[in-house]
Every structure is written in C-alpha cells, then in structure tokens.
C-alpha cells in the first residue's frame, strides 16, 4: 500500500 493516501504523506 502507498504511504501517501491523504494523511501521512500530506504532512
């Protein structure tokens, strides 16, 4: 699974 789906990669 991707690490930037809209919670951890948007930091």
From Swiss-Prot:
Signal peptide: none annotated. The keyword Secreted applies. It is found in: Secreted. GO terms for biological process: neuropeptide signaling pathway. Keywords: Amidation, Neuropeptide, Secreted. The modification Arginine amide is found at residue 11. GO terms for cellular component: extracellular region. Myoactive peptide. Increases the amplitude and frequency of spontaneous contractions and tonus of hindgut muscle. This is Tachykinin-related peptide 5. It comes from Rhodnius prolixus (Triatomid bug).
